[in-house]
Amino acid sequence: LQVAQDVEEIVRQNGAAAATIAVIAGKVHVGLEPDQLELIANANDVVKASVRDLAIVQTLKQSAATTVSATAHIAHLAGMKVFATGGLGGVHRGQNYDESADLIALSNTPIVVISAGVKSILDVGATLERLETFAVPVLGFKTNIFPGFYLKDSGFTLDTQVDSVDQIAEIFQARQELQTNNTAMVVANPAPNQMNPELHDKLLTQGLSECKKQNVTGKAVTPFLLEYFHSNSNGESLRINIEIIKSNAKLAAQIAQAISKK
């Protein structure tokens, strides 16, 4: 809850309107009151909703935190041009048909998404290939290296580095003029202070091994691995998560401000 409140304050301090997105008792909310923010942060019956789940969640009157795909869809419907998240979903390791719905949403939703890359527990190379196939531009903010969420360097380089929010706003405007803006535009913003790479690699290897032992498959893999990192990193995973979302919220607000001036 404190992190969510801090993030909204960071957005306001950087000249943009903060609008946290969630579903509460079947109703989509763009912007939350303090008590609603508390409910989403602390309630035990909050489900995770992708874009495919939104109609079901609404009909069943459930409360839900939204994935990147659902957040992008709702934000676009609400007329928002920019949103911040932690890490993107993508292609799972060794399972070519196991892909996050985030990728499809990015392929058909005209919005700017700021993230710290894709989670390093995924197949980063395959995810970047899919984004290229879907004509989704990926810009590195002050870097030409694609970040891997916990790490600044996923091992993959980017074609485009941008060094200012004004540049990003200009590209946003050019996409509108050229009518190439029917997809999302991803801005990759590396974690301010990455996890120790040796610790990361050890946890990833152990976590993947535990997945196989416990026969964890499908959409259960990502939360399982994230929880494994959280439980076995002595707070490092949580620290980085918090730093990432605050850093991305700040950059998103600055980009939104720059776009509004064009």
Which stretches of residues belong to each language-model region?
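Short, solvent-exposed amphipathic alpha-helical segments in soluble enzyme
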Residues: L1-D6, A126-T133, F149-Y150, S154-T157, ...
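Glycine-rich nucleotide/cofactor/substrate-binding loop typically near the N-terminus or early
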Residues: L1-T59, L178-N193, H200, E210-K212
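Solvent-exposed alpha-helices and their adjacent loops that cap or buttress functional pockets
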Residues: R12-Q13, I74-L77, V82-A84, D98, ...
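General beta-strand structural signal in soluble alpha/beta enzymes
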Residues: A18-V23, A64, V82-G87, V113-S115, ...
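Short, ordered loop/turn segments at secondary-structure junctions
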Residues: V23-G26, G87-G90, A116-K119, F141-F146, ...
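Active-site glycine-rich loop that binds ribose-phosphate moieties when present
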Residues: T67-V68, G94-S107, I111-E132, V165-E170
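A C-terminal functional module that forms or caps the active site or interfaces directly
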Residues: T183-I244
